[in-house]
Curated annotation (Swiss-Prot):
Sorted UniProt keywords: Membrane, Transmembrane, Transmembrane helix
Superkingdom to which the source organism belongs: Eukaryota
InterPro entries: NPB13-like_MII_rpt, NPIP, NPIP_N
Subcellular location: Membrane
Topology in the lipid bilayer: Single-pass membrane protein
One Pfam assignment: NPIP
Native source organism of the sequence: Homo sapiens (Human)
Name the UniProt record assigns to this protein: Nuclear pore complex-interacting protein family member B12
Positions with biased composition (Polar residues): 252-263
Family recorded in the similarity comment: Belongs to the NPIP family.
Biased composition (Basic and acidic residues): 406-416, 698-708, 740-750, 782-792
GO cellular component: membrane
Gene field: NPIPB12
């Protein structure tokens, strides 16, 4: 049996790795029975032992395994292992270790031979101190740590004392530090720096590496902010040597010793060009580029049109043309010759089109530009699309036999001469030619209240400031020449008409739901400026221009098989979404809010449709015009269901039309039972014939603007004409009723009102300059007085005289006298009531108290318990005090001299004249 006894003293534990291995080998050699296995374990101890393992690690376990029979060695080694672990736990925070991870420990093991030179020197003990795990811990190290803590605490206390003393001295004397105090302050600062340096020596490598990286990054960032290139992996000293710049001399008295962060050159000292660096891809600004750039792969990004003074060569994208502002030379011919000139130059007729039975071709919608056509168009199959009214100077041919639709008149602009006689004599010429009264109308019927909108006027004018045009159901079988809806159109509802051209003027809020006919070919449709939205319209123009300030153009489902010549959506257009359309040319110009839901027909070819500037909305319209112009400032035109089989010449919705709602007629109507709907008043200077008998519809009066002559008397005389024409007093009114309180406004009265029962409702106080009549007898409501601003005269006397002005001083004394009680006579006094006598049976007998038994009676108080003599505490006698301990009851009074005593003052006697009388004598009053 091999017995190994090793005494682990602190000196033995303080040995380093080599000494520990040598001593173990010497102990093994001293053993009488050598063991090759034990020697092998000891020899391999140097390879297994490292500074990161514990003192009781794997080498000691090999020794324990080699000698399993020696239980004393096992117990001794385990006790030593526990004690060493405890000591390491205690001094772990003192030796600078930060508890690194296993990855760092493996790095230390692999580099243990190169890390021998990384030890630092302690400033107090001047010994090399390792910063790795497994430091030697001895008594000197414990003493050193204790001295360091004491030094640090003393430095803090001394610094606080010196600082407090210096601050107090400066606060009192108002001076700077003296030489002696400055020296004390510097000494305290030196102690603080020494303590910081000692802590820096204890920084482990993991934290030291992070600190070095931070210093390098800070130095590089400072150099980068100074205008020098950015080198993130070079230190400040390397940067200084590489760039060849010297740091400026320190200007302060106490400069920092480690100036790695201050070795930078200010930007004002850099006067030489910088060497090339890796950041050459950061080019100079475009202000310094005076030479053209070489060609690159991004040649599709062309120069802006302001600098384009020469025409572009032909390319595959010829349909994307150059803007007209920069186009100074004509474009070369291209394959898109179907993009013709605009209709401003279209003065020549179009060639004859294919017959209606022929199938539509792809080239039918590619019309010639109107700008290049300077001669009249030849006749075509679509002769129902008439030429504009400027060329029509002859009367129209006679019309068809009379029908129910003859109420629709011909517009006045188209008539330069009188119409020939026809069967439709009830369709009169416009009011400019009519100076005679209308013939009598037909007898009234039950259907006269519901007016028929199926009429065909020659001209319909819906004037200015009309906000919206909606639900316009036009007639399906008639052909109107012209319809004009004027400026600022607020609302046009419930109309059914079919026109040739329609013009919706500027500032129209929205144009939407325009379902046009699928088989007709309009010449032109213009929706003018300021059109915010065009929604839900179904039409197919040859050219559609939506002008400036249109917010959005969306949901335009145009036909997919047609080829437009050109579509331009101009500047400041917010959105064009979901558009399916095929115009010959469509221009949506600037600042148009929205054009949406325009489902145009896929088989028709209009010449042009223009939606001009700032048109807010045109919604729900179904029409197919030859030309439609929606003019300026029209808020909305919506729900225009036009007929699908007719061809109007023109429909004009003019500028700023305010409101036309539910109106049946703007032109001269034939005579009917509804004579309350009068003709326009501009040309009618003669009185109207007598109307039909009074009916329930007579309340609907004709506007006063249309009446140039007085109306005949009717049953509705309570609805009078405006006061501008009435300068005579009103006739006497009906007998007084409950409704007389509702008076006529004063501005409508040019004469005095007749007397009525409601005279208490007087006219305003400006007309009343006379005193009011005497009031009614006094009542409880007299306290509520009339306001003072309504009274121009004094009020009459009333019973409430106690609400008067303040009484005089003499009246106040009489009012404050107590009144004597009135003496009552013996006959007037009531005798006191006599008490009522009660019978014996009515008197309740008094209840006797119930007698209680002796057992029920509780004793008054328990008897006191008898105590023994030993239980009684003797009374304590008061302690007698000595005479010296007794304080005198009160100090003796100090004797004063006669001169110190002040004599008592006698009260001053007052004269009889100075004495005020106590109360005035009461004045004697008489009995009266």
């Amino acid at each position: 049996m091999v017995k190994l006894s090793i005494v682990l003293t602190p000196q033995f534990l303080s040995h380093d790795q080599g000494q520990l291995t040598k001593e173990l080998q010497q102990h093994v050699k001293s053993v009488t029975c050598p063991c090759e296995y034990l020697r092998k374990v000891i020899n391999t101890l140097a390879d297994h032992h490292h500074r990161g393992t514990d003192f009781g690690g794997s080498p000691w376990l090999h020794v324990i395994i080699a000698f399993p029979t020696s239980y004393k060695v096992v117990i001794t080694l385990w006790i030593v292992y526990l004690w060493v672990s405890l000591l390491k736990t205690i001094f772990w925070s003192r030796n600078g270790h930060d508890g690194s991870t296993d990855v760092q420990q493996r790095a230390w093991r692999s580099n243990r031979r190169r890390q021998e030179g990384l030890r630092s020197i302690c400033m107090h003990t001047k010994k090399r101190v390792s910063s790795f795990r497994g430091n030697k811990i001895g008594l000197k190290d414990v003493i050193t740590l204790r001295r360091h803590v004491e030094t640090k605490v003393r430095a803090k206390i001394r610094k606080r004392k010196v600082t407090t003393k210096i601050n107090h001295h400066d606060k009192i004397n108002g001076k700077r530090k003296t030489a002696r105090k400055q020296k004390m302050f510097q000494r305290a600062q030196e102690l603080r720096r020494r303590a910081e340096d000692y802590h820096k020596c204890k920084i482990p490598p993991s934290a030291r590496k992070a600190l070095c990286n931070w210093v390098r990054m800070a130095a590089a960032e400072h150099r980068h902010s100074s205008g020098l290139p950015y080198w993130p992996y070079l230190t400040a000293e390397t940067l200084k040597n590489r760039m060849g710049h010297q740091p400026p001399p320190p200007t302060q008295q106490h400069s920092i010793t480690d100036n790695s962060l201050s070795l930078k050159t200010p930007p004002e000292c850099v006067l030489t060009p910088l060497p090339p660096s890796a950041d050459d891809n950061l080019k100079t600004p475009p202000e310094c580029v005076l030479t053209p750039l070489p060609p690159s792969a991004d040649d599709n990004l062309k120069t802006p049109p302001e600098c384009l003074l020469t025409p572009l060569p032909p390319s595959a994208d010829d349909n994307l043309k150059t803007p007209p502002e920069c186009l100074l030379t004509p474009l070369p011919p291209s394959a898109d010759d179907n993009l013709k000139t605009p209709p401003e130059c279209l003065l020549t007729p179009l060639p004859p089109s294919a017959p209606p039975s022929a199938p539509p071709s792809a080239d039918d919608n590619l019309k010639t530009r109107a700008e290049c056509l300077l001669h009249p168009l030849p006749p075509s199959a679509d002769d129902n699309l008439k030429t504009p009214s400027e060329r029509q100077l002859t009367p129209l041919p006679p019309s068809a036999p009379p029908s129910a639709d003859d109420n629709i008149k011909t517009p006045a602009e188209r008539l330069r001469g009188p119409l020939p006689p026809s069967a439709d004599d009830n369709l009169k010429t416009p009011s400019e030619r009519q100076l005679t009264p209308l013939p009598p109308s037909a007898p009234p019927s039950a259907d006269d209240n519901i007016k028929t909108p199926a009429f065909h006027p020659q001209r319909m004018i819906i004037s200015r400031h009309l906000p919206s045009v909606s639900s316009l159901p036009f007639h399906p079988q008639l052909h109107s020449q012209q319809m004009i809806i004027s400026r600022y159109l607020l609302s046009v509802c419930g109309f059914r008409f079919h026109h040739q051209p329609m013009i919706i003027s500027r500032h129209l809020p929205s144009v939407s739901s325009l379902p046009f006919h699928p088989q007709l070919h309009p010449q032109q449709m213009i929706i003018s400026r300021h059109l915010p939205s065009v929604c839900g319209g179904r039409f197919h123009p040859q050219r559609m221009i939506i002008s400036r300030h249109l917010p959005s153009v969306s949901s335009l489902p145009f036909h997919p098989q047609l080829h437009p010549q050109q579509m331009i959506i101009s500047r400041h257009l917010p959105s064009v979404c979901g558009g399916r359309f095929h115009p010959q040319r469509m221009i949506i110009s600037r600042h148009l809010p929205s054009v949406s839901s325009l489902p145009f027909h896929p088989q028709l070819h209009p010449q042009q449709m223009i939606i001009s500037r700032h048109l807010p909305s045109v919604c729900g319209g179904r029409f197919h015009p030859q030309r439609m112009i929606i003019s300026r400032h029209l808020p909305s035109v919506s729900s225009l269901p036009f007929h699908p089989q007719l061809h109007p010449q023109q429909m004009i919705i003019s500028r700023h039309l305010p409101s036309v709602c539910g109106e049946r007629l703007r032109g001269p109507l034939p005579p009917s039972a509804d004579d309350n709907l009068k003709t326009p008043s501009e040309r009618q200077l003669t009185p109207l014939p007598p109307s039909a008998p009074p009916s329930a519809d007579d309340n609907i009066k004709t506007p006063a603007e249309r009446l140039r002559g007085p109306l005949p008397p009717s049953a509705d005389d309570n609805l009078k004409t405006p006061s501008e024409r009435q300068l005579t007093p009103l006739p006497p009114s009906a007998p007084p009723s409950a409704d007389d309180n509702i008076k006529t406004p004063a501005e409508r009265l040019r004469g005095p009102l007749p007397p009525s029962a409601d005279d208490n409702l007087k006219t305003p106080s400006e007309r009343q300059l006379t005193p009011l009549p005497p009031s009614a007898p006094p009542s409880a409501d007299d306290n509520i007085k009339t306001p003072a601003e309504r009274l121009r005269g004094p009020l009459p006397p009333s019973a409430d005289d106690n609400l008067k002005t303040p009484p005089l001083a003499t009246q106040e004394a009489e009012a404050e006298k107590p009144r004597k009680p009135k003496r009552q006579r013996a006959a007037e006094m009531e005798p006191p009531p006599e008490p009522k006598r009660r019978r014996v049976g009515d008197v309740e007998p008094s209840r006797k108290p119930k007698r209680r038994r002796a057992a029920d009676v509780e004793p008054s108080s328990p008897e006191p318990k008898r105590r023994r003599v030993g239980d009684v505490e003797p009374s304590r006698k008061p302690k007698r005090r000595r005479a010296a301990d007794v304080e005198p009851s009160s100090p003796e009074p100090k004797r004063r001299r006669v001169g110190d005593v002040e004599p008592s003052r006698k009260p001053k006697r007052r004269r009889a004249a100075d004495v005020e009388p106590s109360l005035p004598e009461p004045k004697r009053r008489r009995l009266s």
